[in-house]
Amino acid sequence: MPNILLLNKPFGVISQFSGGNKAETLSAFIQEKGFYPAGRLDKDSEGLLVLTDNGKLQSQISDPRFKIGKTYIVQIEKIVNERALETLRTGVELNDGITKPALVRRISEPSALWARTPPIRVRNSIPTSWIEITIYEGRNRQIRRMTAAVGFPTLRLVRITVGNWQLGDLLPGQFSKQIVKALN
């Protein structure tokens, strides 16, 4: 049976085990051999990264054809309006095409979220707000580009779920190991 690791990837870490040059890699947190990321989180993003020792499962998780939802909480610049939320829900025109519909809602600032190191830039004259967004595709820096396209740049991006797997109470750099009982 395949094994998975659920890692809370810290900010500034790249989603690979080697070749980080000046950036920290996954090898700083995971010493278990034979595990590979199923999908990516860019260096500036935090949260749930799923790794597996099974190629078929890795493909199912990362391939958009399987429509596995990935949910993020996102801190954005300014107070988001309903028009922007609706555009995010129905599809945003990006330079590589229109995004697929997403599930989006405004949320309060998450109380259980850890402090980011380094902290986000703060501009006292510009308020921020939070949204939760679930996407079913995985273009490069997709959510950052989506929020910027509707006029609300992303300041902080934290993935909290991949399919049925949840970040839970893992702190940055911590991981848990699970056994997958069946592949679809």
Short names for language-model regions:
Residues M1-N184:
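RNA pseudouridine synthases
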